[in-house]
Amino acid sequence: MYKRQERIRVVWSGAEYRGRGRETNWKGRVGFGGAQIQRMEKINAWNHERKLEQYNGDTVVFDAITTGNFGGFDAWLEKSDGATIDVSTNLGVMTVPLSDIGMEDVTMDAGGLERKIRVFRLPEENPHRTITTELEIPLNATGDNPLWVCVTTEDGFQAWSSPIYAFK
């Protein structure tokens, strides 16, 4: 029997614009109305002077900066039947029934350069450690085509390749 996953990931990302002064300050809270947070784990929260913590049994408060990168948290919930997720930030608000959140992103656009908050479910435990894929990538008719590969792990770390050059 299928059991709905109770692990919710909330991610904020993006920048104000390219270049200097691109920082985006995220200040807000995420409430899980009608549910209890059983456990919360931070993602890409390395600045200990910035707040990202659980408040009471149903809310996470945060004060973060992104400059094109991302941060966020995973929350493992209990008693979530009929619950909602209420995201309230200095850049916008979003309220969604938890029953409407699946493995695909539910997004709050916040302007800027790919600036947004994404909410989605993840498996309670992820047994997958490999991926194989094929992509069709349009190439320029002449000259070099530098391609980069970026791998993002579940815990938020990223690894970038050097450019891989394809040419016709």
Where are these regions (language model features)?
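C-terminal functional module detector
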Residues: 3-168
